[in-house]
Amino acid sequence: MKINQYAVVETPFEQQVHELTEIGFYDESVTDAMGAGAAAVWQALLVQAFPEYRDATPKLRELAVDNNRDVATFLQSGAPLTTEIFDAVALQLLGFTETVDYQIDQPLQAVHEFGLPLYEKRGKWDVDDVLTAWYALLTTHTAGGLQFIDDLASRGYFAKTNLPLFFNGKAMATFDTSALIKEVVYVETDVDTDEDGVRDLVRVEIVRPDTSVDVPVLFTASPYYQGLNNEANDAKLHTVDVPLSHKTPNKVRYEDIAFPGVTLPDAEQHEVVAEADEATESFKATSHVDINNYFLARGFAVAYSSGVGTRHSDGMQDTGSPEQVLSMKAVVEWLAGNRVAFTDRTSGYAVKANWSNGKVAMTGKSYLGTLATAVATTGVAGLETVISEAAISDWYQYYRDNGLVIAPGGFPGEDMDVLAELVYSRMHDAADWHRTKDQWTAFQAQTDQMMDRESGNYNAYWDARNYLPHVSDIKADVVMVHGLNDWNVKPRQVFRLWQALQTSGVAKKLYLHQGQHIYINNNRSLDFSDQMNLWLSHKLYGVANQAETQLPDVTWQANDQAETWETRQSWGQTETVALPLAGDDEMSYEDWQIESDFESYKRDFNNWRTEMLKQENDRFEVNRLVFTEAPFENDVVIDGEVTVKLRIKSSENFGLVSAMLVDYGEAQRLGATPTPLGQQIDRGTEWQPTPLVEFKLQKPTTEKMISIGHMNLQNRTAPWQVDDLVADEFVTLNLTLQPTLYRLKAGHKLGVILYGTDFEMTVRGNQDIRYTVDTVNSKLLVPFQQ
């Protein structure tokens, strides 16, 4: 077991004593024991580490200091306290199991192996050593995934004062989650997406502590939150079993299709009849974001809104649109005290967020994180930071790629209109649905036309939903989290955002893990929740904890070892090494399957990809080209975007090329889905427990897909420009694959597979097309870490 902690702040001794006093450990029992020496002080601290017991003295007989003595026996002996004795007991307090996790007579070895930030000093300890060691112990992670102080809090250590308390720069669980206030308001936006001449109102649901102090807010913008239309979603899925066809060439420039900016409607504002002292509507809480639950116990309020075009709000649902983003921006403005909201949709009674300190963070994964990123690009006042996980920064890159209709991994046939159908939760209220059904149907028809599945080209519709051109307007600090095996929201989404932020003046932090489309706040080997606690305590409460310098710029989970996280300063090499593909002049493959295979691969595209990745597979002999480099003599790291430079021709005047970058070599590899460890993490005190998980090494495999990419052969220049393609004439293109950060082990080979139809992601026309590659004039450009 290894635990990687980056949120432990180095603290001067005087400050340690002050904080121990603030949280109740440095009390009269400790000061009374000081005259008796270090062991007596240790005893006074130990008995406070069992909050379930009125008198914890008998517990000292359950803690061993070595093979022969328990703590009580040790204290009676008068022997000096040492690092070995302290650590032997600390490991037990932290929940590690002797003989399973460590040996009682080798505590220091275990501490170093686990990576625990415990205090260490040779020889006999004095009182100050004990206090410093106890402070360090409280910041150390248990085997159950919590700081020890948070573990104690989950067992009732803290009185629920409903007042903020900070330890080692992080907020403590001192708020009563059994008495949270739940209330609803309706925020007036600047948009009128249903075109009724009145500004749209959006429903906001708030959960906050019952406290006398103003608190900051975590806001999650989630179109999913008010309910889903799964049947309508499934009925609207597009068929992907359609042929590719020739596109009429053009000379379109980006300037020709650039989105000119949103024009706000001249819509009527809602009349304010009177000011209400407080909200008048409550709600029954549904499933919430786990990390938000964590912060509710620590003095942060949480707000959720689904935005326009969702249940109990006005307007039409328009995936990723400027209007959707502006509706979420309006919520931030109300939370920061800069916009009006009402107690309901009709009375005109305005209500203020008079419980808020005016500082807001946005959180969430996938669509939720996407809207956090998008709102940040508006530069809205009051938004101090965003924590965006697996977030989209450019919707074209989600449903399209290089002139092709591309499905997010696992969702063939989905598109912007399908996602809108899923979350148009106004369907859930019969009267509202019947009032809006005709307008919604017409609105969806317009979306279908503008998103243009027929060509797959980038146009003004997509440009309006590309947030990258507006990164320079971001004023909030940004935390990004992404899985390098996320083929739903692919890594390019965060890579391009990270690169664009390099010239901004905001603080930015990046976490790259080996998972797919997941949260990582309940991962045992990384103190992610602690790090976000440090970050938000600084950004929203103003705690001077050096969060911006304490947290690494880039935290990367190594792909070749379990429970190993490394820190870096950057991601993305600009220098590349050119590797040849092969020595033959020309090699060909076909993009046609016999009907039985075609139907089989459609039904199970996961099995298709597994078989396709194998270096030797006669079944795909004519449907792909596999190129491999010589085995590496030493470990190498691929850092950024790999480009396949191709000279290729199609037997038709249309075509596509797909490529997979592959690690060939037998090894145990981490699973992309974390394994539950059979334990729950308490998010406060008996509050919203969540499963503790870890990425585990799986059974050995001989290959692993590192990255992937696709391109329409007629969009070689740009996704908005259609180039001509003549049958059986070579063209040259650069196919840039999804970015990665990947360590190839010595003895492994780097491979690239070229093919046509991707049964999971591209259209599947099963057309009889033959592709030929000029391998002499083709190469692989790889950004190896320098």
Language-model segment annotations:
Residues 296-312:
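Conserved alpha/beta-hydrolase
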Residues 5-161, 172, 229-281, 285-292, ...:
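Accessory cap/linker subdomain of secreted extracellular hydrolases
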Residues 487-495:
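Conserved alpha/beta-hydrolase "acid-adjacent" motif
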Residues 4-12, 279-280, 546-786:
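Glycine/threonine-rich phosphate-binding loop and adjacent beta-strand/alpha-helix elements that clamp
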Residues 211, 316-323, 330-361, 366:
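Gly/Ser-rich "nucleophile elbow"/oxyanion-hole loop immediately N-terminal to the catalytic nucleophile
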Residues 168-217, 223-226, 231-234, 239-276, ...:
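N-terminal cap/lid segment of alpha/beta-hydrolase-fold proteins
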